[in-house]
């Protein structure tokens, strides 16, 4: 089958005509949680959105927040009444119109988890956790609308794994065993076990055509409607590994564990397929095939042949870090591996070894190492070499990567450059932070050598700094590092900053200076979470109390000129003092020097003179279409004015008014063309120099509208199709005169169609 929908091509088009403030999503739909077959379509609930795959054409489409979804990290789905697709996630219940390709409704309702849906007489029930209570939630259709009716919770249930309709009853698989009842007759509080002979825990459950399959630790049962459970197979140790079962026919079942497909019948328990790499999540009988959701796409299995289907997306969907390289390659990294967007294609390296029948649509290599619990930092040397720091890795502290053609490991920094800790036979290496100085030396904060948290590296040279060498200013609590514009190294600890300055060769210096500086937040907890220095040589310090700065000066013994921000009474008053920051929060600078701070409550932006963008709340799920409030990192395309915001659910890309200053008008782009009016969205003139103004003119030179530079947002100006008096202009071709305060100018033509 051929995928004719090009995700790479779509990515290149996403941001070609985007206005400041507009946001697009980059997600990965490879991690499939649930899937069903419907006609020629396979419908998938994934960690990156709602996906549709046409079995005949190979066309693949993914719907995200860009298309109206409220959440993209999806758990389960159902094709319910009127053909609507019911989608469950930890953020609520969404209903999708498959024909109009749009969201019909969304119910948040303090939902914390959706386990499964079932349809019962045109009523949809969900096994749902709400405010810490598990129960079933009821939705009804009336007058072509969907309504939430009620939630029936049970305090005696710790979890519901599944819900199925069997005859006129709904059966729940819970941590208390099976519970069943008719929702039209009995309140769920009074539901009881429909099969008292089954008193053990329930592993998996499914029903089809009046046949019920039940998996317990001791047996797999078949139940005919109106009958009693009949054990098909018993006492197989692998029962406990099964998590999903699907009924194909009478006493004919298929079950999956994390890596094995089983065929089950009367006195039959056969292993049909096994591969530890795929991580099966769900199963669905579709025509003569079995559909299998996996952590890397999905598969069709006919009992013999395993046909894997995946597409060109990143395998890293929840990155710890994002980095845009010198060649504009975008790097995503996490404990699962590395994904790189290079020349419109994703290349991937995974710590999971996928061995059998991998789809040729995905570029994936095996990364034979342990990447620990978190990727702490990515830095790039002047030659394009990529250094990736890891925390709690058994393989090493730093990966040196070559990504020119593929993802190749050139080196792994371990002992003696980053010495082992004291964890015994299986030491873990932890690098908390890294930075390059102006001489190309790589500075590293690591916990791997007792009494020597700071080290420096250049090719085969290395040096570890001890507590004693620093005058006992260094400590094991050092977690943040940066360099200033005077090539001095700054490290942060729980209660202080330490500056180090060397003269000559750092590996055998002629002089060294160590200076301690108080943090001065005025708060009880002033530990340093992150450090970064702006182009203006302002040292920005993130603490649990908020964001402060220190203006640096050339003096080696007194390197700080002043600390801020300050209130009118001269006391320090940190920015974002009401935001919860932690050790995963980062400080990044956009092309205009604005400070972006990541958190689990969105990303917060402030300029060096204290102005917030877009306001004091920053960007979060309540005021934007960002994929998640849990923001891990930010990177910037300096030329295009794009901020790539890495979240735990993918990357949100927003057009910001903070691109590099344009030197000419050669990159001016006017869109849409033609401009059809009236329109809810204005015509946009993109690629302007600073302090530009616009005049809309007829071909004969009559000025219809002037847009002064005070109304220009960064490098974009907007026109609503109206003249100076507020009237819509007529159909025709118009001139756009662009000019700045220094006399530079440009003329463009654009067409208007008045409808």
Cite the ranges covered by each PLM segment.
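Short, glycine-anchored, charge-dense loop/turn motifs used at functional sites
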Residues: 693-704, 734
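C-terminal tail/sorting-segment detector
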Residues: 735-755
